[in-house]
Amino acid sequence: MTPSSNSVKTSRFNKVRTDIIGDTDLPNNLIKSLSKSPPHFYNHIIDKKGLRDIIAWAYKSHGIAATAELADDIKDLGFKYATVAAVSISIDDLKIPKEKKFLLEQAEEQITATEERYRLGEITEVERHTKVIDTWTETNERLVLAIKKNFNENDPLNSVWMMANSGARGNISQVRQLVGMRGLMANPQGEIIDLPIRANFKEGLTVTEYVISSYGARKGLVDTALRTADSGYLTRRLVDVAQDVIVREDDCGTERGIVVEADEKGNYGTKLVGRLAAQSVVVDNENRVLVRRNREIDLITACRIEAADIPSVIVRSPLTCEAARSVCRKCYGWALAHNALVDLGEAVGIIAAQSIGEPGTQLTMRTFHTGGVSTAETGLVRSTLEGSIIFGSKARVRPYRTPHGVEAQQAETDFVLQVKPNNGKKSQKVDITNGSLLFVSDSQEVASDTILAQIISGSSVKKSVEKATKDVICDLAGQVRYDEALQPKEVIDRQGSATHKATRLGRVWVLSGDVYNLPPNAKPVIQGNSKVEEGEVLAESRLSSEHGGVVRLRESTGDSREVQIVTTSMTLKDFKLLGESTHSGEIWHLEAKDTTRYLLKTQPGSKIGNGEVIAELADERFRTKTGGLVKYAPGGLSIKKARSAKNGYEVNKGGTLLWIPQETHEINKDISLLMIEDGQWIEDKTEVVKDIFSQIAGIVTVTQKNDILREITVRPGTLYPCNESKVIERFKGEGLLVDEEEIISKNLKAEKRVFVQSVETSEGPQLLIRPVEEYTIPEVAHLPELAIVKQNSGPYLGLKATQRLNFKDGELIKSVEGVELLKTQLILETFDTTPQMTVDVEKVTDKRSKTLERLQLVILETLLVRRDTISDASHGSTHTELQVNDGDLVKSGDVVATTQILCKEVGIVQLPKQIDNEPIRRIIVERDQDTMTIPLGSAPLVSVGQRLVDGDLLAENDPSPCCGQVETIKNNTIIIRIGRPYMISSDSTLHVKDRELVQRGDSLALLVFERQKTGDIVQGLPRIEELLEARRPRDSAVLCKQPGVLTLRHDEETDSSIAVIKSANGEETEYPILLGRNLMVSVGQHIKAGELLTDGPINPHELLEYLFADLRSRKPLMEAAREAIAKVQSRLVTEVQNVYKSQGVTIHNKHIEVIVRQMTSKVRIEDAGETTLLPGELIELRHVEKVNKAMFMTSSSPAVFIPELLGITKASLNTDSFISAASFQETTRVLTEAAIEGKTDYLRGLKENVIIGRLIPAGTGFSGFEEELRSEAGPHPDILDEDPAGYRRMQNLRPDYTVDMPAAASASPAALLDDPSDDELEATRSRHGIEVTTSNTAAFTRPVIVNKIMEDQILDPDIIASLQEEGLLTRE
């Protein structure tokens, strides 16, 4: 954009000399001239960034109004020229670069080569996938460069290009999709699909590409939706933790600060701008002070510091601020909104929370690059000349396999690599850093332009990696062979199951062959290594009967038919089987010769098991007329203990059952419907309640509750008056059985067995003599005659008759109708059935009389016979023959059917080795197409059993045409068994054993590999959350507990390494290094506490604990805590900043510092000493420091504590304000605890005040009461620090009530009323005869602004005394 002089009103900027703020890409001469006047005309392209800098400069120099005008003018200018030039996007503007075709061809070639390497077993499946993805990513990046070059050189004024380039509309990655290629897509699991979309939107997508494209698009939409919710919740938690951080002081007076370091190039960026120096910055060699302590660092000062090459500056920070429960202005520095020192009362906590939470939605899919290390941080170095490589004496390297499966070496030290030319010219020198990869070896001869190394810059952020697994699927059927190099070992896991793991990188081969799966119980009928023809029988399975019996053939269903063998049968030949139809289905009865009827409990055609009831005899002889009481006669009847009374109680021993009848009506109606009285004698057919009649005569008992009639009991019998109290007492309550001839009372003797009860009637106490019915229970139940037909080895089948009583001794049956006391059951006695062996209930026609039907129980052995099948991929064709006919009698072990597995093609059979007599489940036939015969022109160079890949030499000038194993060598002819190698990385789990047979599609192994987490939502938001919630990561890195020197030891038992660190005092600490973990340090190196020993995410709690423990051993408690916290704080700030930076989001450090300050402000008391604190309590560090100072002054023992790192949620719940905590989460728990502890909420934060509905103590609501309180406190200003009332007044909690006094010579202490009501004020005034209008006497008023008594006022002592008595006045 080239502004013309008439389109921008420059008059206003002519006379002002200015500075520019913000790091800028504008040329230096432009910057210099912008800050001078008058402005000159510059012909520069100004893009989005240039515009930003101009606006920032205008705002800094000329204020808001002028800047708004300038912005408006620039906008008009832009629109004017866009209109004149007719800038718009049309399809012709999308120009595809010619290089695209060439780049795609190159990529295809690379991928074909990779696929070939994979086929030859040189790289693993994971390495292939990584290489493919990296190839496409690189192609995409090269295509972007081609697009840029194409537009810049051929069509710089192209509309699409101008819009994307200037930042007006779209960006380069969108243009890439329009004219380059759409690129790689992710599937819903976030994994990258290795098939890229080669077309762009102008060319149009194929159907496949369209589907894959939709996959990625859908994922984008879903992720955006999820991100919004996650980001919102993160913001809410952040606001909650920091809402009470308000700038309350001007200067806390601290001398501490944090160190801000310059980057590798010596730049600070905006890290220093707006901060205050905690220590003066001095240029060492000149003794020149660049900025004094407690002075602001603006852009110019920052540039001077950079120019003086000062590596680090100590600045003040919210992290080190010592203001109580807030931040002071000097530690916070500039408010970023207006680039000046922050005002008092600014709610910096909420600003910080919003600044961190808001970009959460932007932490999105900016990257799709998973494999390898991203190209930005690594540099490939090529040789510039031809010569030999010299590593030098300092070089230490170890073998390394790159993620693409290239064998290389990794440098363990920094050294210089030289390429020494053969012609004696100057050598090429390359600086190799620790961790760089070398693709050449020492003394190797290299040509010009050979890749020598991949240099990894030291500053590269450690990418977070995760363990992932991938299955290796077999592409062909055959036999598995291990390579020697694999060295598998057995690993037993916690559950005790054994798995095999590869200890080294090596190949698993599958040698081709036709594998047959044998059905269970099939046995091979052919010898190993014998030749078979098509259709020949390979194996045979025999189906035999276990017990023998009579054969029944059923109709076939689906692909199998059923053969049933009747092993045992039992017919109930005494009984006729009778069926009758009812509306609820068919009911079957068994009728005996004496016409007693059993009800059949199992329907004919059903299957039953042992112990089930077949039939039940309902015996009318044991049916009562009414309800009543059951008693077992003593010394006779007994029952078996039953777990449940559902089916009654089995009779153990026969005897007499006694039945005392009574009638019980359950009513549940209003008492007003009762038509008789309690204790009344009634006749039968009497109406007891409306519409309810008694069936028998007897005495009535009425049960009622709350005027609701519950039940009415009628007990039959005879009433006898009785006045003997002993007799009445004896038969009280439930009553007693009285035997025949037993004396009941003086003039009463039992003629037969009766039941006696004493009852209260209107005529006084009487004896009720109740009749007893006797039922005789036989000793054993009658069992009908059975006819049993049984095989010798067959299971037993029988019936058992049992008698069951429905009620136990003393049970009361509440009923009007009669009940059954006893039932006889026929129960099946047999073995426990299995799915193959079941008991069936059948009806059969009687052999003598065709009209009669009998019940028969049979035990059936059911065998399923498979139909013939045609061969498929894993099975040969089968042929099944039945060896029996319907009705045949077979013996135990006889063969019922045979199934033969037939061979599909001509070949040689091989049987696998039998292990521990395990049955053979698969056999393999080696066919002609599984081998290749190769004639040789000269003597062979290979031996039998050797495994080869394509291109290996068999003899001079005879390369192998295939992969496989050499089977035979005869007369210069080689036969190779075709195979397929699969590369398996170390530590992978092997799913197959050596020489095992596998089908196509079986899993051979599970590769374990590390992959970088993708830097999208999976990496962004959850990572921020993980850091701010201070989560303990899974599989965290091993940290060093105390400083010392590292040595390594090998543990034979677990086959793992142990790192041993020996400290200065000779103490040794052991750290087991788990399998798959990489050591981050080398042997002999000195390591500090808290440093990483292995790779992996750091557990921040562990880090704080170890740092504190180490510092505690050398420094005082307070100093150690401060220093340990500072280190963890600095790490947290850096980590959070890294996540945002990786997504291109800029957040000022001070915002993150405010949040981190809240997370690290608390300590946990370990030993309270002589303080009033409690062990385990979480307390602010500042508070403990004060308490310990007091203890020191009184020579008491101080509190001992450990610093604690709290996640934002935990910190919010542990805040001083219970109102704020309760409104966040776990309301009930927080309020309950606050109530139990009797907490006070001083309403210091914003949230508490909003909830109570008061003015918030920030912004204009923040009153600067500090000075007034100081003057009021007089000679003891320190009491304000601890005095809650002081705080309350400072924040204007509520208007206090003051007393206006007449003028006086001397000052008096302040008097405050304890919040009286209007009526109380009025009453007090009138009682003391005070008028509101008077000025010479004290008048009680509610103040408007004044909150203290003026110094020239005095109080009448009598008035004070009476006010104090009434409790209306307190003395402060």
Swiss-Prot record:
Chief location of this protein within or outside the cell: plastid
The EC number(s) this enzyme carries: 2.7.7.6
Cofactor: Zn(2+)
One Pfam family hit: RNA_pol_Rpb1_3
Gene3D superfamilies: 1.10.132.30, 1.10.150.390, 1.10.1790.20, 2.40.50.100, RNA polymerase Rpb1, domain 3
Keyword list, A-Z: DNA-directed RNA polymerase, Metal-binding, Nucleotidyltransferase, Organellar chromatophore, Plastid, Transcription, Transferase, Zinc
GO terms of molecular function: DNA binding; DNA-directed RNA polymerase activity; metal ion binding
Residues where Zn(2+) binds: 252, 321, 328, 331
GO biological process: DNA-templated transcription
EC main group: transferase
GO CC field: DNA-directed RNA polymerase complex; mitochondrion; organellar chromatophore; plastid
InterPro entries cross-referenced by the UniProt entry: DNA-dir_RpoC2_beta_pp, DNA-dir_RpoC_beta_prime, RNA_pol_Rpb1_3, RNA_pol_Rpb1_3_sf, RNA_pol_Rpb1_4, RNA_pol_Rpb1_5, Rpb1_funnel_sf
Catalytic activity: RNA(n) + a ribonucleoside 5'-triphosphate = RNA(n+1) + diphosphate
Note describing how the cofactor binds: Binds 1 Zn(2+) ion per subunit.
Compartments where located: Plastid, Organellar chromatophore
Disulfide bonds: none
Quaternary structure (record): In plastids the minimal PEP RNA polymerase catalytic core is composed of four subunits: alpha, beta, beta', and beta''. When a (nuclear-encoded) sigma factor is associated with the core the holoenzyme is formed, which can initiate transcription.
Family the UniProt entry places it in: Belongs to the RNA polymerase beta' chain family. RpoC2 subfamily.
Functional note: DNA-dependent RNA polymerase catalyzes the transcription of DNA into RNA using the four ribonucleoside triphosphates as substrates.
Protein name: DNA-directed RNA polymerase subunit beta''
Biological source species: Paulinella chromatophora
Gene: rpoC2
